[in-house]
Amino acid sequence: MATPSKKTSTPSPQPSKRALPRDPSSEVPSKRKNSAPQLPLLQSSGPFVEGSIVRISMENFLTYDICEVSPGPHLNMIVGANGTGKSSIVCAICLGLAGKPAFMGRADKVGFFVKRGCSRGMVEIELFRASGNLVITREIDVAKNQSFWFINKKSTTQKIVEEKVAALNIQVGNLCQFLPQDKVGEFAKLSKIELLEATEKSIGPPEMHKYHCELKNLREKEKQLETSCKEKTEYLQKMVQRNERYKQDVERFYERKRHLDLIEMLEAKRPWVEYENVRQEYEEVKLVRDRVKEEVRKLKEGQIPVTCRIEEMENERHNLEARIKEKATDIKEASQKCKQKQDVIERKDKHIEELQQALIVKQNEELDRQRRIGNTRKMIEDLQNELKTTENCENLQPQIDAITNDLRRIQDEKALCEGEIIDKRRERETLEKEKKSVDDHIVRFDNLMNQKEDKLRQRFRDTYDAVLWLRNNRDKFKQRVCEPIMLTINMKDNKNAKYIENHIPSNDLRAFVFESQEDMEVFLKEVRDNKKLRVNAVIAPKSSYADKAPSRSLNELKQYGFFSYLRELFDAPDPVMSYLCCQYHIHEVPVGTEKTRERIERVIQETRLKQIYTAEEKYVVKTSFYSNKVISSNTSLKVAQFLTVTVDLEQRRHLEEQLKEIHRKLQAVDSGLIALRETSKHLEHKDNELRQKKKELLERKTKKRQLEQKISSKLGSLKLMEQDTCNLEEEERKASTKIKEINVQKAKLVTELTNLIKICTSLHIQKVDLILQNTTVISEKNKLESDYMAASSQLRLTEQHFIELDENRQRLLQKCKELMKRARQVCNLGAEQTLPQEYQTQVPTIPNGHNSSLPMVFQDLPNTLDEIDALLTEERSRASCFTGLNPTIVQEYTKREEEIEQLTEELKGKKVELDQYRENISQVKERWLNPLKELVEKINEKFSNFFSSMQCAGEVDLHTENEEDYDKYGIRIRVKFRSSTQLHELTPHHQSGGERSVSTMLYLMALQELNRCPFRVVDEINQGMDPINERRVFEMVVNTACKENTSQYFFITPKLLQNLPYSEKMTVLFVYNGPHMLEPNTWNLKAFQRRRRRITFTQPS
């Protein structure tokens, strides 16, 4: 857990805390970038090949603060002691070119590659392209564990970066091209098949791996077809043999079968005849519909000139109506004057009528008064007679008072009863609300529990089935049995569920917890042995650990960011909690925060805790048995899956008890309501009886008083009527005088009115003349409009007729389709299936454009529905005469015959398909295998030469046990390092580590001269080699990687032998570190060279 020291090296134009210098003796001239933020892309077309790495920049990456590496175009040897940061450059190449973090074998999250204590890091790779260099930048955010990508300083996505990298044939995930330090051992573990695939992708043409994959798919389908053909052939032979045994019995059935076949053909033809009848009707309707459509078009064209003429007549009508309106205005004025005179005359007439009417009214009033006086006298006489006959009224008031008191008492009782009913109703409503609230709470609890059980059922079905069995059989156990731990645990805060799930293995999370060994044996015998369910069971400790105190107080740990022990994060039954404390020490494992992770080194050193949880990681701390050093490892926490749902079972039981109490109270309230309603009903009945008695007594008491009041009232009315008299003769004289005066005034007004009528008549004559002209115009216009309306009506009728015909056509078309579908179903034809030509007699056209056909045998059958129905009846009668035959045998025989025919056809089709697959395989195999053999032969030649130069033997061949199993093809590497042994296949176990490293290196060098990739990376491949082999391998690497037109090569090593041969084309990059290194901005390469030369020159010879 020690923090890496700052690394420095030779000067670099860009300031940095760590940089890689060039060896002055082997430095290849190149243009270096200055420190400006916007850097121009390198456009050099020197010895670099397309896709080679020109520059690598890192900021806050692993051990580096800031570093820039400028590799050469050929062999780049990166040298440095272990831990200086050589492999960090390899990681930068991988991650910078969109490689997966897990491929490096160091961490599975990209955030772990950022230098500790930094929140962001950056890797930038510049790749050579003739059209302009490609600069790929990857910025890493530690908090989000997220990357941000840029191409030539422009934001982009990882997918586009991967496409750009793939276009340059760069495969950072291929061990034949990119072999990091942690993957060197895995190369030897590659199977022959994996090695072939990696080699194809690395140096083969692009289509080679595609052909190989296509061959594997074709071969797999060929095997399936071969197996299918073999199975169908064997089954077909069995079916034929079985039918031969029943042939004699079936022949006796043929006569009956002939009739049944004819019935079947008749039933099959019947829907075709129905279809043909409807189709002919459809064709007839379609012809009529087309004729009507043409008629509609002609009617619409004929209406255009009529419309124009109507508009002309309308304009003329407007002019005449304007003149008529002027005359009407003059007439209106004259008529108004006439009206005024006439109104005055009418008022005079009305006045005379009113005088006459007033006189008549007075006459009628006098007659009515005399009649009313007579009627009143007779009524008084009748009332007096009735009063005499009425008996003296007895004293009824005491009885009325007694009934009134009884009514008041009953009303009080009713009010009291109604109040109690209202109280009961309110009490019941309150209880119902409480019941609904409790029911809702229980439903929510059940939903949460169902969620947990659904997760258990989906992931561990056997455990779920065992839970159901346990719930139905708890009586078989003597002591308490807890359901699986994941169901009984309830998190206090769901966000902490990840700590529990990462701490307790899933096998124990789904385990049942028992308090008794005997109970557990009963359970396992029933569930595991009898029901064959795979379940886990554990026993809780006899003495409870649930309340055991931790070894140190949480207050001591809060300074490091710890907020709780695991035990305090959840609730569980005592047996479960006791088991977890005993088995997993959850009372001793603290949970911290991000603050804990930031101080993790201090926490580990000072607390000596064995297990620690931070916000997102788990740390396991151990002490070395030999060196007593503290060793820690950390893993990222997995997301919680099971414990995020929390159910409080104790609270649910409390709610169920509460619900039972509410039900009991509701029953008591309902009983009280029934009794109160009966009491209220009885009181209501008694109240009605008393009111009726009181009403009868009051009527008897008030009758005499009413008669006396009526007689007194009538006598007063009679006196008033006798006093109200009228003089009719005087009234008649006054009315006659007033009428004469009014008639004189009326005669004068009539003369004035006559003169005004003459003027008005003249104006009317002039207006009538204009109206006649307008009428002529309107008549002509109306005639045109009538013709237009008639034509429009005819058009609407024709259009309606067209719509009806079109709807009928659609209906018939749909019916045709339905009949055709039914007919095809009867003939067992699919939607797109047609009958063979030899069974067709005619091809009627279906309205939807498809064609169908009638079987040839139909032509010998009747062509009308009546004839078909008659023949069907006859044939059915004949078929029913055949008895005593076993239809089951015939059905089985026929079914087998059909299956035999179907299998024969299927077998033919399968064989044809199989031949096609074999032909395709042959073609693809030729395109794939021949180039592959040539490629492997070239690899073998290079590989053998390299081994021969080392006085060893090695060969590479294309290996397969069966030439047809294309998924089993592989590249086999066989090596021999001693003359006394035979060639042995390269495996992780047979050869030593150094021998595997030599073999791996030489194989990669063999690929180097054939490779299409722009660069190759090999990290610390020489570890474990003896000095002789290491020297030989190094010489071959230099010779191979420094040839003209070869791809770029990165060779990372922590050590070098003395007096190794070097090439002018290779680049040596040294990696230094240490607390006393100079800062990059103070490093001056030229000054260092000058001082070095002075020291060399001044040394005594």
Curated annotation (Swiss-Prot):
SUPFAM superfamilies: P-loop containing nucleoside triphosphate hydrolases. Sumoylated. Ubiquitinated. ATP binds at residues 80-87. Residues 1-43 are annotated as: Disordered. Its main location: nucleus. Residues 1-17 have a biased composition (Low complexity). Gene3D superfamilies: P-loop containing nucleotide triphosphate hydrolases. It is found in: Nucleus; Chromosome; Nucleus, PML body; Chromosome, Telomere. Widely expressed. Strongly expressed in testis. GO terms for molecular function: ATP binding; ATP hydrolysis activity; DNA secondary structure binding; single-stranded DNA binding. GO terms for cellular component: cell junction; chromosome, centromeric region; chromosome, telomeric region; cytoplasm; interchromatin granule; nuclear speck; nucleoplasm; nucleus. Keywords: ATP-binding, Cell cycle, Cell division, Chromosome, Coiled coil, Disease variant, DNA damage, DNA recombination, DNA repair, Mitosis, Nucleotide-binding, Nucleus, Phosphoprotein, Telomere, Ubl conjugation. The modification Phosphoserine is found at residues 25, 35. Residues 207-445, 647-828, 888-927 form a coiled coil. The flexible hinge domain, which separates the large intramolecular coiled coil regions, allows the heterotypic interaction with the corresponding domain of SMC6, forming a V-shaped heterodimer. Forms a heterodimer with SMC6. Component of the SMC5-SMC6 complex which consists at least of SMC5, SMC6, NSMCE2, NSMCE1, NSMCE4A or EID3 and NSMCE3. Interacts with NSMCE2. Interacts with SLF2; this interaction induces an association of the SLF1-SLF2 complex with the SMC5-SMC6 complex. Interacts with RAD18; this interaction is increased in a SLF1 or SLF2-dependent manner. (Microbial infection) SMC5-SMC6 complex interacts with Hepatitis B X protein. It is linked to Atelis syndrome 2: A form of Atelis syndrome, an autosomal recessive neurodevelopmental disorder characterized by mild to severe developmental delay, learning difficulties, microcephaly, and growth restriction with short stature. Additional features include anemia, skin hyperpigmentation, ocular anomalies, congenital heart defects, and mild skeletal abnormalities. Death in childhood may occur. Patient cells show spontaneous chromosome breakage and chromosomal anomalies, hallmarked by segmented and dicentric chromosomes and mosaic variegated hyperploidy. Core component of the SMC5-SMC6 complex, a complex involved in repair of DNA double-strand breaks by homologous recombination. The complex may promote sister chromatid homologous recombination by recruiting the SMC1-SMC3 cohesin complex to double-strand breaks. The complex is required for telomere maintenance via recombination in ALT (alternative lengthening of telomeres) cell lines and mediates sumoylation of shelterin complex (telosome) components which is proposed to lead to shelterin complex disassembly in ALT-associated PML bodies (APBs). This is Structural maintenance of chromosomes protein 5.
